[in-house]
Amino acid sequence: MPDIDKAVAKFNLNEYYDQALNLIVSGRARNAFDLKQEKDKTRDLYGRNTFGQSCLLARRLVEAGTRVVEVVWPKVANSDNHSWVVHQGLEARMKNQSAPMLDQGLSGLLTDMDQRGLLDDTLIVWGGEFG
């Protein structure tokens, strides 16, 4: 019996596999990806940029029943996504780009989840490459 099969048998992971598959095929998670279903006011709360809309998507996935959601902030070429890694022009980029995006996206997520009663059962962790 391969190691993964032993782990499944030992920890009864089949139930988790079934839940994950059901989440995907049921359409709940798939529908969560359609941000156009949100009101403009809600989308604006998070910020109309890659990070802000990713935070909104995270909230929608939690509402859809997703148990673990991760929002990453990579550098994306030719986009509004300025990334958190700044090696040149630190002061200007942090003040004018990265910090405002973070502030609006994360505070929008916390505000929206609180208004919907989702913070009672949700752990949100924010961290950077140095903690």
Name the predicted role of every residue range.
Residues 1-131:
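Ligand-binding pockets and gating/stacking loops
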